[in-house]
Amino acid sequence: MSFVAHPNIDPRSLGKVGVLLGGRSAEREISLMSGNGVLAALQSRGVDAHGFDPGLQGVAELAAAGFDRVFIALHGRYGEDGTIQGLLEQLGVPYTGSGVLASALAMDKQATKRLWMTHGLATPRFAMLHADTDFDAVVADLGLPLIVKPAREGSSIGLTKVTAADQMRAAFDKAAALDNDVIAETFVDGAELTCPVVGEGDTAEALPVIRIVAPEANYDYQNKYFTDDTQYLCPSGLDAEVERQVQALAVQAYRVLGCRGWARADVMLRADGTPFLLEMNTSPGMTGHSLVPMAARAVGISYEDFVLQVLAAATLDLHPNEHWKPE
């Protein structure tokens, strides 16, 4: 395991650190929770860490802050879609998590699924929806139930489980209010799983799988963050070989997208034992209900030590010497 229980990291070597939190996406509330947790964890380890909210503070302020590296605790648009990553590349400030391209790909569910399919990785069949789409034809092709959701949102925001064809229009309208691109995918009936991955390229490896048991099998925004009724099982209770298969699939999905640092793959395990990839989260939640810290704890890594190691791995797509400097 590249991440360890007691990392030998000198907090002074990390310099002045910015924790980006809040932002302007529909997931702002969750990002504030994640970011404040990360900020407190880093400060408890002696890191010179400071919160920075791009939803309230501008680019000039970020450039003037003098951060030596940044922990991205933003979720959703402008935070994990390549936007802030591109800005930090321009500023030459190393940041946590995936680079510009991998972040943009993973945020776009259509692009992610097409890439996974090209590499032979199992993911539910899907169709893109538009206002003039023949919804009956989509239902006839994909079957019911369907999951209809914005193509570029997270935390189950704007998501609807459609069980009858006459529900399609309302489901589309709900998702389209958040994104111009709406996706419908076949519903996979089975166990809901998630698997964090850390590292990069050939060194990427999976943390333990978590099985999610939500009230009435409805793991929505409310049940993800604001209820204690959802059960998170880690160890997952899966057969050891099935767990290894899910972990291997998560690592493959991570590598295909070009992710680095850390991410979390969401997976459905069909009753016949076949795992299906749903999406990849390149800036996972770090709240009290979040799953990555839970998986880390299962292998003896505390929240604080995990955060410290994510930060220590901050980097850039380009080597600092490759960044343009005015003559």
Curated annotation (Swiss-Prot):
Name of the protein this chain belongs to: D-alanine--D-alanine ligase
First-tier enzyme category under EC: ligase
Signal peptide: none
GO biological process, one term: cell wall organization
Reactions performed catalytically: 2 D-alanine + ATP = D-alanyl-D-alanine + ADP + phosphate + H(+)
EC assignment: 6.3.2.4
Main location per the UniProt record: cytoplasm
Residues binding Mg(2+) 2: E279, N281
Binding site for Mg(2+) 1: D266, E279
Location within or outside the cell: Cytoplasm
Annotated keywords: ATP-binding, Cell shape, Cell wall biogenesis/degradation, Cytoplasm, Ligase, Magnesium, Manganese, Metal-binding, Nucleotide-binding, Peptidoglycan synthesis
Function: Cell wall formation.
Domain of life: Bacteria
Gene: ddl
Note on cofactor: Binds 2 magnesium or manganese ions per subunit.
Family: Belongs to the D-alanine--D-alanine ligase family.
